[in-house]
Regions:
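Short amphipathic, positively biased membrane-proximal segments
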Residues: 1-274
Length: 274
């Protein structure tokens, strides 16, 4: 049996990646619970993302602990990605079947594309974290240990989250200048990560941008909580205002992706040192 070094940089990176996946899955769990409750769970399949994200949170909590998550981990990560992919299909179908099809109005008010896509990311990153934690540095020709593929995938995930935030903040007419923060800072972070993936070099600027992106997720949740409080009745009327106000669960996805990006940076630093 392969011996797992629980103090190696690779294991530390696996913990960061798994921790980021926990945050993404937590965001999906809270968001899908609220939105599918709003839809009265009209389709029995609407329960699936709640179950998949809950299992993903539990399994990813063991990230970096070698085999402590057991052989169940790969199956749970695959299931999360599969449920997310199916949900993405359902949501796209829901948008296209509306009058006018793929219009801004339908993208604004119909089933969000970003939520199931985030579950795909949680499953994917969870799987990568597990492979690294058990000493598997590659998937076929893809070298996970270098951190470059992980950085590229994280940059893609950040830009997808930026697109979702941009769409919904555009719906809100960017009435608060702070609504530009999750568009600008994470975009710079994604660009820096993409460059690092191409050159195999990150640096302090990329790390600083990732830290800023993580902070944007936390600050965004606070702004959204304030937005909920501004609705009639404030937090005393939380049952209605949580559904009507800005989603509390959305911004922390930036934090999760930024933490995963830091894991990729750690792998690249280790690879550069040989």
């Amino acid at each position: 049996m392969r011996t797992i070094d629980l103090k190696s940089p690779r294991t530390d990176a696996a913990r960061l990646i798994g921790g980021g996946a926990v945050l993404i899955a937590s965001s999906v769990l809270a968001d899908s619970a609220m939105e599918h409750y709003r839809g009265s769970f009209a389709n029995p399949a609407m329960v699936a993302p709640l179950a998949a994200s809950t299992v993903s949170i539990a399994v990813n909590s063991f990230a970096g602990d070698g085999r402590s998550a057991g052989s169940f981990a790969p199956a749970s990560h695959a299931a999360a990605a599969a449920v997310g992919t199916a949900g993405l299909g359902f949501h796209v179908y829901n948008i296209l079947r509306q009058p006018g099809g793929l219009t801004l109005s339908n993208l604004f008010y119909q089933a969000p594309i970003g939520a199931p896509a985030a579950l795909v990311l949680a499953g994917t990153f969870g799987s990568l974290s597990h492979r690294l934690s058990v000493g598997k540095n590659s998937i076929g020709p893809i070298d996970l240990g270098s951190g470059r593929w992980l950085a590229a995938l994280t940059a893609f995930g950040i830009m997808g989250t930026v697109a979702e935030a941009g769409l919904l903040h555009f719906r809100g007419a960017f009435h608060n200048p702070a609504m530009w923060l999750p568009i600008t800072l994470p975009s710079l972070s994604a660009a820096a990560l993409a460059k690092a993936a191409l050159t195999a070099r990150g640096g302090t600027i990329t790390t600083a941008l990732l830290a800023a992106t993580a902070a944007v997720g936390l600050v965004g949740a606070a702004f959204h909580a304030y937005g909920v409080s501004r609705n009639m009745g404030g937090w005393k009327n939380w049952r209605q205002n949580l559904l009507a106000g800005p989603p509390l669960s959305a911004p922390p996805a930036f934090t999760g992706l930024a933490i995963i990006g830091l894991g990729a940076m750690l792998l690249m630093s280790r690879s550069a040192r040989g």
